[in-house]
C-alpha cells in the first residue's frame, strides 16, 4: 500500500514541499533563512492575534490599551515584546535572505525573485503600520512624516494623502484603517509566500557554486529539516534573549510618550530596519527626488537580473565582485547609522556620499567589474 503522505491529495502537497523535495547536497547555512522567515511570520501572526484581542484602535484609548496589555494581561508584556522584537528578527532574516540572493545569484530565477520583492514591500508596509498602532509620539509623527511623502506626487499628491489619512491630519480614522490593514496584510503575505515557494519549486534551489545541481540532489527530510532546526533554535534563543533582557533596546524612548499633535519630537526617525532607506530619502534636498530615491532603493533589486553581466552565476569564485559586495554591505550599515543621526554637518555629507555609493555600486561598478572578471578568465 502506498504511504498516505504520498497518496492523500493534501498530504502529497506537503510531502512534495517539505519531505521528499529534492535539494542540492551542498547548500550552506545561508539557505536557512527561508525557513526562519516562515517561523518569524508564524510568530508574528500568533502574537499579533492575541494582542489584537486586547488592543483598541481608537486615539483616546490606543496608548492606554497597550499599557493595559503590558501591565494587566497575563503574559501580555511577553506577547507585546515578542511581537515588537519579532519584527526586528524578521527584518534581520529578510536582509540576510536578500543578501544571500545577491551574493549567490539567486535573482536569476526572476519569478521567485520578483515575488520576493513584492513580499519585501508588503512586510515593510505591515511593519510601518504596526509602528503607528501604540499611538506614542514616534508612532504619530512617523505616520505623519511618511504618509506626507506621498504629497510629493504631482497633481494627485495632496488628495491622495488626505484620502489615506481620512481627514486633514493623522487622526482616529487613520489609526483605525492602519489597524485593519496591519491585521490583513500578514495573511496576504502568507499567500505570497506560497506563490514564492511555488515558483522556487518549479526551478529547484540554487546552491553556493551557482552550477546546476540536478545530478546531485538529496531529500529535504531528514537532512535539511535537521539543519533548519538548528537555525530555528539559534534565532529563538536570540529573540528570547532580546525580549527577556533588553526588550526596549531597538525601540525609541519617545514612543512611551502618548501622541501629541502639538509637540514635535526633536528627531523623528523610523524603526532601525528602515533607517538605510530613510537616510537615502533625507540625502536628496528635493521632496519628489527623495521619495523616488527611497522607492528605488528597494525597487533597484528588480533590476538585478538585467544587471548581471558575469558568465558565472555565483560570486563564490569572483574575488573582485566579492569586494564590491562587502563594500555594499558596509555602505548599507553606514546608511543605517546616518539615518538615526540628526540632520547636521558632517552627517548630511556622509549620507549623501553613502547614497551615491549605494546606487553607483549596484548600477555601475558591479556590472563593470563582472565584465572585467569575464576577460580575466580568458588569461
Swiss-Prot record:
The keyword Transmembrane helix belongs to this UniProt entry's keyword annotation: yes
GO cellular component assignments: mitochondrial inner membrane; respiratory chain complex III
GO BP terms, alphabetized: mitochondrial electron transport, ubiquinol to cytochrome c
Residues that hold heme b b562 according to the record: 83, 182
Membrane topology designation: Multi-pass membrane protein
InterPro entries assigned to the protein according to its UniProt record, in alphabetical order: Cyt_b/b6_C, Cyt_b/b6_C_sf, Cyt_b/b6_N, Cytb/b6-like_sf, Cytochrome_b, Cytochrome_b_C_euk/bac, Cytochrome_b_N_euk/bac, Di-haem_cyt_TM
Recorded GO MF terms: metal ion binding; ubiquinol-cytochrome-c reductase activity
Residues that hold heme b b566 according to the record: 97, 196
Residue intervals passing through the bilayer: 33-53, 77-98, 113-133, 178-198, 226-246, 288-308, 320-340, 347-367
Cofactor binding notes: Binds 2 heme b groups non-covalently.
The keyword Chaperone is assigned to this record: no
Cellular location(s): Mitochondrion inner membrane
Main location: mitochondrion
One Pfam family it belongs to: Cytochrom_B_C
Requisite cofactors: heme b
Gene3D superfamilies per record: Cytochrome Bc1 Complex, Chain C (1.20.810.10)
Complex and partners: The cytochrome bc1 complex contains 11 subunits: 3 respiratory subunits (MT-CYB, CYC1 and UQCRFS1), 2 core proteins (UQCRC1 and UQCRC2) and 6 low-molecular weight proteins (UQCRH/QCR6, UQCRB/QCR7, UQCRQ/QCR8, UQCR10/QCR9, UQCR11/QCR10 and a cleavage product of UQCRFS1). This cytochrome bc1 complex then forms a dimer.
Other comments on record: Heme 1 (or BL or b562) is low-potential and absorbs at about 562 nm, and heme 2 (or BH or b566) is high-potential and absorbs at about 566 nm.
Similarity comment: Belongs to the cytochrome b family.
Job description of the protein: Component of the ubiquinol-cytochrome c reductase complex (complex III or cytochrome b-c1 complex) that is part of the mitochondrial respiratory chain. The b-c1 complex mediates electron transfer from ubiquinol to cytochrome c. Contributes to the generation of a proton gradient across the mitochondrial membrane that is then used for ATP synthesis.
UniProt protein name: Cytochrome b
Species in which this protein is naturally found: Dobsonia inermis
Taxonomy of the source species: Eukaryota, Metazoa, Chordata, Craniata, Vertebrata
Amino acid at each position: 500500500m502506498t504511504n498516505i503522505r504520498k497518496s492523500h491529495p493534501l498530504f502529497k502537497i506537503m510531502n512534495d514541499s517539505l519531505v521528499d523535495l529534492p535539494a542540492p547536497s551542498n547548500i550552506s547555512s545561508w539557505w536557512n533563512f527561508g525557513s526562519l522567515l516562515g517561523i518569524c511570520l508564524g510568530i508574528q501572526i500568533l502574537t499579533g492575534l492575541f494582542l489584537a484581542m486586547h488592543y483598541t484602535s481608537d486615539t483616546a484609548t490606543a496608548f492606554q490599551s497597550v499599557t493595559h496589555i503590558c501591565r494587566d494581561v497575563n503574559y501580555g508584556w511577553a506577547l507585546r515584546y515578542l511581537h515588537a522584537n519579532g519584527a526586528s528578527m524578521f527584518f534581520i532574516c529578510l536582509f540576510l535572505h536578500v543578501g544571500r540572493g545577491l551574493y549567490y545569484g539567486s535573482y536569476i530565477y526572476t519569478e521567485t525573485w520578483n515575488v520576493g520583492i513584492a513580499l519585501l514591500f508588503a512586510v515593510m508596509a505591515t511593519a510601518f503600520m504596526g509602528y503607528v498602532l501604540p499611538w506614542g509620539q514616534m508612532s504619530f509623527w512617523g505616520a505623519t512624516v511618511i504618509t506626507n511623502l506621498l504629497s510629493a506626487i504631482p497633481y494627485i499628491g495632496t488628495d491622495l494623502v488626505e484620502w489615506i489619512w481620512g481627514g486633514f491630519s493623522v487622526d482616529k480614522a487613520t489609526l483605525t484603517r492602519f489597524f485593519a490593514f496591519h491585521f490583513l496584510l500578514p495573511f496576504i503575505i502568507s499567500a505570497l509566500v506560497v506563490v514564492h515557494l511555488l515558483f522556487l519549486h518549479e526551478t529547484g534551489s540554487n546552491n553556493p557554486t551557482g552550477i546546476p545541481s540536478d545530478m546531485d540532489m538529496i531529500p529535504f527530510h531528514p537532512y535539511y529539516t535537521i539543519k533548519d532546526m538548528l537555525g530555528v533554535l539559534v534565532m529563538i534563543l536570540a529573540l528570547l534573549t532580546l525580549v527577556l533582557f533588553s526588550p526596549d533596546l531597538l525601540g525609541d524612548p519617545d514612543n512611551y510618550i502618548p501622541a501629541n499633535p502639538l509637540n514635535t519630537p526633536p528627531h523623528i526617525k523610523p524603526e532601525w530596519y528602515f533607517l538605510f532607506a530613510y537616510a537615502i530619502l533625507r540625502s536628496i534636498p528635493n521632496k519628489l527626488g527623495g521619495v523616488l530615491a527611497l522607492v528605488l532603493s528597494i525597487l533597484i533589486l528588480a533590476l538585478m537580473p538585467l544587471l548581471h553581466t558575469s558568465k558565472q552565476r555565483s560570486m563564490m569564485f569572483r574575488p573582485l565582485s566579492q569586494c564590491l559586495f562587502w563594500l555594499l554591505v558596509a555602505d548599507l550599515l553606514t546608511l543605517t547609522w546616518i539615518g538615526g543621526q540628526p540632520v547636521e554637518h558632517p552627517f548630511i555629507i556622509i549620507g549623501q556620499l553613502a547614497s551615491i555609493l549605494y546606487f553607483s555600486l549596484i548600477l555601475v561598478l558591479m556590472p563593470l567589474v563582472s565584465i572585467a572578471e569575464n576577460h580575466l578568465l580568458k588569461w
